[in-house]
């Protein structure tokens, strides 16, 4: 399991360096990934959601107020989920906002059409 966490951390570092997917949004994937980094262990291994994960989700929700920023956040989250691969528990990831008391305007899922997020 330590190898999985090392791989997840390496992927996260690459995603932070990669930056934004689109140029219409002020929000970068680096910012999204930084805010959600504390959630990786939970979505891969389960257990208790770390308080830092909830803080990151709340912060990300507060900075992603415009439609382009929300769409960008959605795209970044999907990219991170794809990078984590089969080790990702989609149900855990989808449940984080509610567990953290955050209402986001879209479902956390790789099947979400980010273009429809408002």
Curated annotation (Swiss-Prot):
<feature type="signal peptide">
    <location>
        <begin position="1"/>
        <end position="25"/>
    </location>
</feature>
<keyword id="KW-0961">Cell wall biogenesis/degradation</keyword>
<dbReference type="GO" id="GO:0071555">
    <property type="term" value="P:cell wall organization"/>
</dbReference>
<comment type="function">
    <text>Plant non-specific lipid-transfer proteins transfer phospholipids as well as galactolipids across membranes. May play a role in wax or cutin deposition in the cell walls of expanding epidermal cells and certain secretory tissues.</text>
</comment>
<dbReference type="GO" id="GO:0009534">
    <property type="term" value="C:chloroplast thylakoid"/>
</dbReference>
<dbReference type="InterPro" id="IPR000528">
    <property type="entry name" value="Plant_nsLTP"/>
</dbReference>
<dbReference type="GO" id="GO:0005516">
    <property type="term" value="F:calmodulin binding"/>
</dbReference>
<dbReference type="GO" id="GO:0006869">
    <property type="term" value="P:lipid transport"/>
</dbReference>
<feature type="disulfide bond">
    <location>
        <begin position="39"/>
        <end position="53"/>
    </location>
</feature>
<dbReference type="InterPro" id="IPR016140">
    <property type="entry name" value="Bifunc_inhib/LTP/seed_store"/>
</dbReference>
<keyword id="KW-0964">Secreted</keyword>
<dbReference type="Pfam" id="PF00234">
    <property type="entry name" value="Tryp_alpha_amyl"/>
</dbReference>
<keyword id="KW-0813">Transport</keyword>
<feature type="disulfide bond">
    <location>
        <begin position="74"/>
        <end position="114"/>
    </location>
</feature>
<keyword id="KW-0446">Lipid-binding</keyword>
<feature type="disulfide bond">
    <location>
        <begin position="54"/>
        <end position="100"/>
    </location>
</feature>
<dbReference type="GO" id="GO:0005794">
    <property type="term" value="C:Golgi apparatus"/>
</dbReference>
<keyword id="KW-0732">Signal</keyword>
<dbReference type="GO" id="GO:0099503">
    <property type="term" value="C:secretory vesicle"/>
</dbReference>
<dbReference type="GO" id="GO:0009505">
    <property type="term" value="C:plant-type cell wall"/>
</dbReference>
<feature type="disulfide bond">
    <location>
        <begin position="29"/>
        <end position="76"/>
    </location>
</feature>
<dbReference type="GO" id="GO:0005886">
    <property type="term" value="C:plasma membrane"/>
</dbReference>
<keyword id="KW-1015">Disulfide bond</keyword>
<dbReference type="GO" id="GO:0048046">
    <property type="term" value="C:apoplast"/>
</dbReference>
<dbReference type="GO" id="GO:0008289">
    <property type="term" value="F:lipid binding"/>
</dbReference>
<comment type="similarity">
    <text>Belongs to the plant LTP family.</text>
</comment>
<protein>
    <recommendedName>
        <fullName>Non-specific lipid-transfer protein 1</fullName>
    </recommendedName>
</protein>
<dbReference type="InterPro" id="IPR036312">
    <property type="entry name" value="Bifun_inhib/LTP/seed_sf"/>
</dbReference>
<keyword id="KW-0134">Cell wall</keyword>
């Amino acid at each position: 399991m330590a190898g999985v966490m090392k791989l997840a951390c390496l992927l996260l570092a690459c995603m932070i360096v990669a930056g934004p997917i689109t140029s219409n949004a002020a929000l970068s994937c680096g910012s999204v990934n930084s805010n959600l980094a504390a959630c990786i262990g939970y979505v891969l291994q389960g257990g208790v959601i770390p308080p830092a994960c909830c803080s990151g989700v709340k912060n990300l929700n507060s900075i992603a107020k415009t439609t382009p920023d929300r769409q960008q956040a959605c795209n970044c989250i999907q990219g991170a989920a794809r990078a984590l691969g089969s080790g990702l528990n989609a149900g855990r990831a989808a449940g984080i906002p509610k567990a953290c008391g955050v209402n986001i305007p879209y479902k956390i899922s790789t099947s979400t059409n980010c273009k429809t997020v408002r």
